[in-house]
């Protein structure tokens, strides 16, 4: 935990004794680390680990004072490759911090859309929709993306079930 956190002593002592949550156990089971901090100097230089299920390299970031309610992650898609298709029961905002590529989003009704993005793009993945990201850059390390869950959705949603959104 950061030494300059402005929290009450009571809250700080709770953080010291806080047990693992299903969410933190899931991150560990995925083979990834959670980097606790208030500030990351350069998202392009944080150490990443292979994320086998997704097919890229990643690390989760956690704002110290909010615990896991404001997690986000940095992910790198290998050059000329794609991440495995997947869906999630949380909202996700994506800020592209390097490279270029495309994303395909689809729902169970068959509606499908593909769009391109590049460095500086910001877009959202609709709740519970399938999606797949593609790196259109041919250089190693060309694409690093910061994915942030809107309003801390991912850790908090847990097992809530949501209706499929229309694209």
Give short role names for the model-derived ranges.
Residues 1-69, 161-166:
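A short, N-terminal "cap"/entry segment at the start of jelly-roll beta-barrel domains
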Residues 54-59, 71-88:
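Conserved short histidine dyad/triad with adjacent acidic residue
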Residues 60-64, 83-88, 105, 114-115, ...:
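Short histidine-centered beta-strand/loop micro-motifs
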Residues 74-75, 85-87, 91-96, 114-115, ...:
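His/acidic/aromatic-lined binding-pocket segments of jelly-roll/cupin-type domains
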Residues 78-79, 89-108:
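Glycine- and acidic-residue-biased ligand/ion/polar-headgroup-sensing regions
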Residues 82-84, 102, 121-133:
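Histidine-centered metal-chelating micro-motifs
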Residues 93-95, 123-124, 138-158:
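A short hydrophobic beta-strand segment most commonly corresponding to one strand
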Residues 107-128:
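Short acidic-glycine-tyrosine-enriched beta hairpin
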């Amino acid at each position: 935990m950061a030494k300059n956190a402005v929290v009450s002593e009571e809250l700080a002592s709770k953080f010291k004794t806080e047990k693992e949550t299903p969410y933190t156990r899931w991150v560990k089971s995925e083979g990834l680390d959670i980097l606790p901090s208030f500030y990351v100097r350069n998202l392009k230089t944080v150490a990443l680990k292979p994320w086998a299920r997704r097919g890229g390299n990643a690390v989760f970031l956690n704002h110290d004072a909010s615990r896991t309610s404001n997690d986000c992650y940095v992910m790198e898609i290998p050059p000329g490759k794609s991440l495995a298709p997947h869906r999630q029961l949380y909202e996700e905002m994506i800020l592209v911090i390097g490279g270029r590529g495309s994303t395909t989003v689809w729902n169970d009704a068959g509606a499908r859309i593909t769009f391109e993005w590049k460095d500086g793009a910001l877009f959202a993945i609709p709740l519970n929709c399938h999606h797949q990201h593609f790196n259109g850059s041919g250089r190693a390390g060309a694409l690093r993306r910061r994915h942030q869950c809107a309003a801390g959705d991912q850790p908090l949603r847990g097992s809530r079930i949501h209706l499929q959104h229309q694209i």
